[in-house]
Amino acid sequence: MTQKLYYIDSHMKTFTATVTACAQNGDRYEIILDRTAFFPEGGGQLGDSGYIGSVRVFDTHERGDEIIHYVNRPVEPGSEVNCIIDWDVRFRRMQNHSGEHIVSGLVHKKYGYNNVGFHMGSDVVTIDFDGELSAEQLAEIEREANLVVAENRKVKTFFPSAQELKNLEYRSKKEIDGQVRIVEIEDTDICACCAPHVLSTAEVGTVRILSSERRRRGGEGVRITMLCGLDAYDNEVVISRNNTEISMLLSAKRNETAAAVQRLLSENEKLKARSASLCRAFALMKAEEVVPTQGNICLFDDILDEASLRLLVNETVKKCEGVAAVFSGSDETGFKYIIGSRNIDLRKAAKAINAGISGRGGGSPEMIQGSCTSCTENIKDFLIAFSF
């Protein structure tokens, strides 16, 4: 049975231990120590990584009463080894995990909702609650969570007796067999949890609720995405730098960038509408200039948008008995095409057309569209002579 040092001291970064077993399993080795501060995956928190001597530990799991350390090369059983935890990774996970307990405890106290799903990923933490929470309610929960952090409340862990547990009100997402470990955050939360936590709420640093969405599975409720501590700080630094760049680009104050972007979007919509109107007028004018023919029409254009190109084709087919084709692009980059006809089933003709212009595409009997890599001269020669 491995002695679990992480329950004695969640902040233990280094320790010595004796290797009691080492066995190969595929392309990795599994090491068991007589005692360990490496936390195995559990309670929603990933297993620790670090070093046993000079050997890299890339994951840890619990198997029965033993903690399995996964490494890439063997260590002799009986060896006494110096071990190091990847502390930055562990501490960030503890910050996020304890922060999750704070938020879940506040939501449960305030609204009676239960945490029914928790995932600590490599970039964010998500919590699923079985009730709806508005943006205003989540903002209030975030504010209260940060007050709990600022008040430096104690975080206590203990193993209650069966009788004590019977009289204890605590949160738990599932039925637990065997001895239950309790994590209690002073005046905030009492929850069953097997993972290591910070010693006081001040160590959490900060709590940021980043977003929320309706739960996709498992009934009604909300999923929130959050970060705490150093991970939250790193995220805020990126956001702040981006906001500074936006403020400089738009010549706006840092606290007025959203309004500046909204104005830019509004102006852009007006310009898009004006551009679409001009493109439409130009397409109609260009179609008007086309000379009617009994054969095919082939046009090239680099100005019109897709809607206006379609309009140009629709207007041009009225002036020919064959196909009306419009190409947009260049010999260097290739072309996109739209081809229409009143008299030819283009769905059937598409294969022959694509073969002639090194293209690919399809559509309806009246209109096809796609792309091609043939050059301008070859496209013109093929389309003008094309019959089906």
PLM ranges: what are they?
Residues M1-F388:
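A glycine- and charged-residue-rich anion-binding loop/surface
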